[in-house]
């Protein structure tokens, strides 16, 4: 039984919260980390803390994504671990939703995931090794009122991950989708004192991602649901 090992990670849609927790965990495990976001100014402190490198990229633009992978390859190494954390939202009564806002939400949540995954897979297939992780949400499996665009994007991302897992697992690429069913704790958003641990801790989520990455190929997870102990489902 062999535990997979990874050397270079690329986190797309990086920011504070889960992405930061993942960057810290991976850097502690001696994995080189690249962070990608539309605006990288916000990533300065995290890069200083973890030794990660930041790259500007619009994940919905095919040329930008191809350029991103080229930059990471030249300046760090070819990623053998890719995490897609980006998501887009547009909320409101169904008849009030602007088509352009809906299209953008779907593009960020799902189409960007396709573009990033395609570039990753092209590089992983020759070595028959790699992992691609997608961050989903409650909306990956449940469409909420006045949140159709988010559900559309997250449903599509889940379908992408499932299709990829079925095609690519036999070729040595571990594809996994995570349903984050609940609010993630942050400095700006935390639970009430009388409801301890009623929100997801980003460090705990990152640890679950890591546990999936350590799975031997004889027992791979393709989807994992994570929620606080008091979350109804």
Residue ranges and their predicted role:
Residues 49-63:
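Rossmann-fold cofactor-recognition segment
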Residues 29-45:
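Conserved glycine-rich Rossmann-like NAD(P)H-binding loop of the short-chain dehydrogenase/reductase
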Residues 170-185, 191-233:
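C-terminal helical subdomain
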Residues 6-7, 78-79, 93, 124-137, ...:
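Active-site loop of short-chain dehydrogenase/reductase
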Residues 131-156, 161-162, 166-169, 184:
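Catalytic loop of short-chain dehydrogenase/reductase
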Residues 15-16:
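Conserved glycine-rich cofactor-binding loop
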Residues 117-118, 162:
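A short, exposed helix-loop element centered on a Lys and neighboring polar residues
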Residues 88, 95-114, 133, 157:
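Catalytic Tyr-X3-Lys loop
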């Amino acid at each position: 039984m062999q535990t997979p090992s990874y050397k270079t990670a690329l986190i797309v849609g990086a920011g504070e919260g889960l992405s930061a927790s993942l960057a810290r965990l991976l850097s502690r495990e001696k994995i080189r980390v690249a962070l990608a976001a539309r605006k990288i100014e916000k990533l300065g402190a995290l890069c200083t803390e973890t030794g990660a490198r930041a790259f500007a990229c619009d994940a919905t633009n095919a040329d930008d994504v191809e350029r991103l992978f080229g930059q990471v390859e030249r300046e760090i190494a070819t990623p053998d671990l890719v995490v897609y954390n980006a998501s887009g939202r547009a909320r409101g009564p169904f008849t009030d939703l602007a088509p352009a806002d809906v299209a953008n939400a779907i593009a960020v949540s799902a189409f960007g995931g396709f573009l990033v995954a395609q570039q990753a897979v092209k590089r992983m297939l020759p070595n028959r090794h790699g992992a691609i992780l997608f961050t989903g949400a409650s909306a990956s499996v449940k469409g909420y009122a006045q949140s159709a665009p988010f559900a559309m994007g997250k449903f599509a991302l889940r379908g992408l991950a499932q299709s990829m897992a079925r095609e690519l697992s036999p070729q040595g690429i571990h594809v996994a989708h995570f349903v984050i069913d609940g609010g993630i704790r942050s400095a700006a958003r935390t639970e009430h004192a009388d409801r301890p641990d009623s929100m997801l801790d980003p460090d705990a989520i990152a640890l679950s991602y890591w546990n999936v990455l350590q799975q031997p190929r004889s027992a791979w997870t393709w989807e994992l649901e994570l929620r606080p102990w008091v979350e109804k489902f």
